[in-house]
Amino acid sequence: MPKIAANKCHKRILRFFHKNHLIIMLAIIFVVGCSVVWLLLKNLDRKNYKEVFVSVYDVQKNYKKAKDTIINTGSSLEYSLLGVPPIKVDKSVEIFKSYNKSVERLEKLNISHDQDISNQYNMFINKNEQFKIYINNLSKSIDSINNISKECKKSNSVLDTEMNPDKIAPSYADMMPSCIGAWNNLRNSKIQSLSRLANNISKLMLNNRKNLDELQDASIKGRQAKILSIVEEIRKNNREMIIIAGRFSEDIKEELRAIDLEDDLKNLNDFTAKRILTVD
């Protein structure tokens, strides 16, 4: 009996498969197809997220370089007024261009399918517009800043190293016209702190220029008391320039804080890293 029952069951199964073999085959194909599509989409997501992650990291790296370059610009002008070798900023424009290109590469990636990453990305892009304007405006002033380093790097050190006023006047005066001209070129900068710095320094430079003419006259006439008074006035102006330049270094850092992108990039990086781990 058990054998007969088993045979009947076997026949029913065969009959079922025979009658429904087409449906069963389609079901198998459907399941396999869905699995393949799911794996492809998963791999595509993984690839997209990794591309975003690498691009964001590239932006972060270039942003740090751009930020350091901006800060060095402030230090360079301050060092120029101190009469010590300034930090070179001649490669600043290239660094800013590299940053902009890394952002452009990120913009070309498709991340609209992920709402969280897309939102964070949009926040970064909106704030980056301000940073982009800032570095573009600074790029236009780099030649003038480098010219200041070239024309003014010895101007203020002369009075501190040469104690004889008869020697001070001609060597100092020879540098003044080109130095004043270099600072004047910065007065029209669209960066407010830079324009303000140039205006203040130019006024003090012009004042020193007037003092130098008086110093030469007093030196010729041998008026020792007048000579010492003028030298002290020039030194006072020089000290004021250094204070103003130091204030500019702080102003430029404050401007950077207002448009800082570090947290936005970190958040974008963190979101993308989590997605990669989830997909894997």
Report each predicted region and the residues it spans:
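N-terminal Sec-pathway targeting helices
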Residues: 9-30
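N-terminal intrinsically disordered, acidic low-complexity segments at the extreme N-terminus
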Residues: 1-10
